[in-house]
């Protein structure tokens, strides 16, 4: 018969055995959880179950996976022990290399292939003025005839029939030739006069604003008073008029009419 101390040891060992087994089983379960500290440190992830909806597209996924493996050799699926950023770094470097080497050359080839053909610009045809078929040739005047015609034109721009007949006979010319020469000379004088007037306008343009001209002198007191209106019952003294270019309104309207 065993002593009481031995019985207590056996009893305690029997009680501690199941308790220790339960603790070990609990530790194993805790360590097997995917969000535990040990699982995160060891970076061991349990295989994820594919949903039922993705089962039909397994063939497409396989083809996409094979094509990716063919495009990027050596950059397969990330192992369980590889760092998280390894795949992204390799993919970035591979994409940069492909853009620099293949995409650049292909783009240049495409641009050279579809370049537009060079344009052959034809010179513009110069359109000449067509003269009449029955046009008379120009009269070749001599130097003495031209001097006599100019002297006569300065004296008188319009000749009578008798004067033209006498003058043409003295120069050995026809009346028609003298008549046409005087017509052309009057047109030339008119053009020269218009050019001189245009030069005078351009020279006097900085003195007055553009598009402005006064038909009367503005410094006259009577005409300056007429700007304020003489029909007003109480006449005001004449005020000094400011520069007209400061106002965009017409000169006939004043502040007293608008008030």
From Swiss-Prot:
Source species, domain of life: Eukaryota
GO MF assignments: DNA-binding transcription factor activity, RNA polymerase II-specific; RNA polymerase II transcription regulatory region sequence-specific DNA binding
Annotated DNA-binding residue span(s): 134-193
This protein's encoding gene: MSX2
Sequence ranges of Basic and acidic residues compositional bias: 1-11
Gene3D superfamilies given in the database record: Homeodomain-like
Protein function: Acts as a transcriptional regulator in bone development. Binds to DNA. Morphogenetic role.
Protein name (record): Homeobox protein MSX-2
Annotated organism of origin: Gallus gallus
Entry keyword annotation includes Cytoplasm: no
